[in-house]
Amino acid sequence: MFIGITQRLICNDSYHEKRECLALDWGKLFNKDLFKNFTPLPLSYEIDFSYYKHLIKAVILSGGNDLSFYSPNVLSKKRDLYEKQVIEICLEEKIPLLGICRGAQMIAHYFNSHISPCENHIGKHEVFFSKEKFISNSFHNFAIEKLGEDLVELCLAKDNTIEAFKHKYENIFGIMWHIERENGLNNIQILKEWFSLIKE
């Protein structure tokens, strides 16, 4: 089963070329037993997402690039427009959607959450989930302070910013840590819940 993944956008100045890319960590992640039933399908921003929707069973909005709302550059704007379409089609077609770091921020922003600059979210830190806590990686300059009314928190950081959430009614989850990087799978309960929504 294919899981579509949005990609980071970069500009290679020496070649005057805009590029889509995914970290090699994503390939390593899909080699793990947890992902053995799935194959990643990188999504191109030059191909309308409606073309992909019949090929995939779920979508991951990956990390990289700040939202254009906070970093108004051409690449961020292009990515925001595409991922907005992805969210809307996933809602229409009931396609399970997972946001990772920037992807979680994109979903949170779409559903009217409050996002602001943060400090001390680089490296690793404690995450509080129900009555448990675990260590996760952390690589973001913006944090979700308050969720929109359609979203519910699942995990918090020590500063009470949102580390994970889900939609109250739709098949949508957001995680602020990078599942593909070191300390990304120290707690997989939320990931397993999202997997349970994916139908063959």
UniProtKB/Swiss-Prot annotation:
Residue span, Glutamine amidotransferase type-1 domain: 20-200
GO CC terms of this entry: cytosol
Broadest EC class assigned to this enzyme: hydrolase
GO molecular function: hydrolase activity, acting on carbon-nitrogen (but not peptide) bonds, in linear amides
Catalytic residues identified in the record: C101 (nucleophile), H178, E180
Function in brief: Involved in the biosynthesis of the O-methyl phosphoramidate (MeOPN) group found on the capsular polysaccharide (CPS) of C.jejuni. Catalyzes the hydrolysis of CDP-L-glutamine to L-glutamate and cytidine diphosphoramidate.
GO terms (BP aspect): capsule polysaccharide biosynthetic process
Identification of the protein by name: Gamma-glutamyl-CDP-amidate hydrolase
Alphabetical UniProt keywords: Capsule biogenesis/degradation, Hydrolase
Signal peptide: none
Pathway(s) served: Capsule biogenesis; capsule polysaccharide biosynthesis
Catalysed reactions, semicolon-separated: N(5)-(cytidine 5'-diphosphoramidyl)-L-glutamine + H2O = cytidine 5'-diphosphoramidate + L-glutamate + H(+)
EC number, UniProt record: 3.5.1.129
Traits of the deletion mutant: Mutant does not express the MeOPN CPS modification.
Membrane-crossing segments per the record: none
Superkingdom of the organism of origin: Bacteria
Pfam family, one: GATase
